[in-house]
Structures are given as C-alpha cells and as structure tokens.
Amino acid sequence: MAQRRYWFICVACCFLHFAVSLAAQTLQIVTADGVSRTLTAAQIAGSPHVTVSVKDHDVAAQFEGVPLATLLAGAGVQLGDKLRGPRLTEVLMVDAADHYQVVFALAEIDPAFATREIILADKRDGKPLDAKEGPFRIVAPGDKRPARWVRQVTGLRVSAVK
C-alpha cells in the first residue's frame, strides 16, 4: 500500500511540474474590457522582434523581444489616435511569477507618445533568457533604475485608474 502511495505521489508531482512549466511558458494579456488572450512562447518567438542595447546592472547587453505596443495592439488594446481623453488614465500592470508587479502608463508604451520602445524580451545577447530571468522579461530602455525591468513575466493587464 505504501509503495502505491509513493508512486501516486511521484506521478502527481511530475504532472504538477509539467503544468507549472507549461504555465511559465505562456503570457496572459487582459484588456481594460476584460478580454483575455493567452500567448505561448512559440507565438511570442514568432512575432516581429526588435533589439535594444542597454546596460543591465552596468553590464552591456542586447535584448531581443516584441515591443509591448505590438503585443497590446494584437490583443485589441487601441493605441495611437484612439488613446486620448479618459483613455489616458489607462495603465499596464505587469505581473511576475514571484508576484512582483509594476505599472506603465499606456502613453509610455504607445509610439505615438513615446520615443522609446519598451519590450517583452525573450533573448539576451542572442540566447534565450535563462530560468532566472525568463522566459519573458520587460526591458524599459531609458529608465534610470531597472526596477521596472520585470523578470519572469506571466501577465499584462490593462486597466483604467479612477
């Protein structure tokens, strides 16, 4: 009986590990209207990428990833001429696996307002992000401190500040 219980626990742990690994390889985007879209690592890897050259803790690095504006537009978030008036109160909450969260105003992300591209990186110096950083990381060139460079990103949520 104890041996069966042991095997059951082993199998359950394997399935749990597999489920956590799969969840870690996806990104959930939720719009201000509550519409949710989940992207896989493969879908993100297949999206148009840009490269940004930055210093990460005083070390030169090149990150490759998808501009947040591209990801949000693909999920149905209206940017550009549609981002005006009351919609300028909308923000993007970035969620990490360790429950760390940061906020960006949508205007910071929108190329119609901002001169920099904030990206969801999946590569650093030509290699996939390691488990400590990835699979996804926010890179915000121009921030004086990297406090909003979220590692292990799991979700992007748009909401209006009231």
Describe each model-derived feature in a short phrase.
Residues M1-Y6:
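N-terminal secretory signal peptides that target proteins for export/translocation
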Residues L22-K162:
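N-terminal intrinsically disordered, low-complexity segments enriched in P/E/S/T
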Residues I9-S21:
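Bacterial N-terminal signal peptides
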